[in-house]
């Protein structure tokens, strides 16, 4: 196994809150997968939930070396928790095609949040 990419992102939670206040659900619709959207709609801390997903997806896009462009979209990266509660990534569409092209065999996700910030790191391996 070799490390193919590493990405880190930090999000100011108040910034996400301000965008939601201005534009309603538009940001959530753009960032979240369908499964994440269903969770977000009833989540007890929707702003924090969205901020953490945003951080992971930005970190993943950086790990892939592309950013969000050329057909990649935030909602093609889905954050879920395994049976132990560990954050994991599931890919869809162009993100999945890119992972296959690069030979990605494993993705590691770490996620942390405090009162004002959410931070994520993603490592992709062959």
Swiss-Prot record:
Cofactor (UniProt): Mg(2+)
Keyword match Cytoplasm: yes
GO CC, alphabetical: cytoplasm
The entry's keywords: Cytoplasm, Fatty acid biosynthesis, Fatty acid metabolism, Lipid biosynthesis, Lipid metabolism, Magnesium, Metal-binding, Transferase
GO molecular function: holo-[acyl-carrier-protein] synthase activity; magnesium ion binding
Coiled-coil intervals, chain numbering: none
Chief location category: cytoplasm
Reaction(s) this enzyme catalyzes, per UniProt: apo-[ACP] + CoA = holo-[ACP] + adenosine 3',5'-bisphosphate + H(+)
Pfam families assigned to the protein according to its UniProt record, in alphabetical order: ACPS
Biological function: Transfers the 4'-phosphopantetheine moiety from coenzyme A to the 'Ser-36' of acyl-carrier-protein.
Quaternary data: Homodimer.
Protein name, per record: Holo-[acyl-carrier-protein] synthase
Organism expressing this protein natively: Escherichia coli O157:H7
């Amino acid at each position: 196994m070799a490390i193919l990419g590493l990405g880190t992102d930090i999000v100011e939670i108040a910034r996400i809150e301000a965008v939601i206040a201005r534009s309603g659900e538009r940001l959530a619709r753009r960032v979240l997968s369908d499964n994440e959207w269903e969770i977000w709609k009833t989540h007890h801390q929707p702003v924090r939930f969205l901020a953490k997903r945003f951080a992971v997806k930005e970190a993943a896009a950086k790990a892939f070396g592309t950013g969000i462009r050329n057909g990649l979209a935030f909602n093609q990266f889905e954050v879920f928790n395994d049976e132990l509660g560990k954050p994991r990534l599931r890919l869809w569409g162009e993100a999945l095609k890119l992972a296959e092209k690069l030979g990605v065999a494993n993705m590691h996700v770490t996620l942390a949040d405090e009162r004002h910030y959410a931070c994520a790191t993603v490592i992709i391996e062959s």
